[in-house]
């Protein structure tokens, strides 16, 4: 009967992995928002992760995977935009939200505009409004859609701050590609509505 089916479904639901880590990351994101990202004084301040991810025991400290289906792009995602992380994949800027989703978050994810023959974020500025960008982490896959593209100066910190009430990721890379990238291009993506549960 339906009672037995419900009970069986509840028994097969697996518990949330790494619950203490998730609590810590959610608390970090909340504090970042409540503090108005006061330590985000320049893009140089974004190299170090606000949270050390090694506590999870994940190999190489990879936090997750960034996927952009339109570009057939999948990259490892790290916390903190250090030179090593940027060489190995995409990196969340320190002093911006950890990419776990949730209201009042904006995880800014940087990538080189091509590196050692690999495209990395070379074609990210070509994304159009409505294109999908996904992040898979220890707790599942978060689905976002591109809502805006913007070109900024490297010192325009306000452009990458959390926007109240929204669940965002912002892809960031150098612009223009051909002339050494003196500016930055932002591709702002918002979480798909049906998934704003966390």
Predicted regions and their residues:
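Solvent-exposed, non-transmembrane regions of membrane-associated and secreted proteins
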Residues: 1-198
């Amino acid at each position: 009967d339906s009672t037995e089916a419900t009970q069986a479904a509840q028994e097969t639901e697996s518990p949330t992995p790494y619950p203490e880590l998730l609590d810590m990351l959610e608390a970090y994101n909340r504090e970042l928002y409540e503090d108005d990202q006061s330590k985000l004084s320049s893009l140089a301040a974004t190299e170090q992760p606000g949270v050390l991810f090694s506590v999870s025991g994940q190999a190489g400290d990879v936090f997750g995977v960034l996927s952009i289906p339109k570009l057939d792009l999948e990259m490892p995602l790290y916390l903190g935009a250090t030179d090593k992380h940027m060489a190995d994949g995409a990196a969340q800027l320190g002093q911006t939200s950890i990419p776990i989703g949730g209201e009042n978050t904006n995880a800014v994810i940087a990538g080189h505009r091509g590196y050692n023959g690999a495209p990395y974020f070379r074609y990210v500025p070509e994304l159009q409004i409505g294109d999908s960008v996904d992040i898979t982490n220890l707790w599942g896959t978060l689905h976002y859609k591109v809502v805006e593209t913007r070109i900024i100066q490297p010192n325009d910190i306000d452009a990458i701050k959390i926007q109240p009430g929204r669940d965002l990721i912002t892809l960031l890379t150098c612009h223009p590609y051909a002339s050494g990238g003196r500016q930055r291009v932002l591709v702002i993506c918002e979480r798909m509505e049906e998934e704003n549960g966390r």
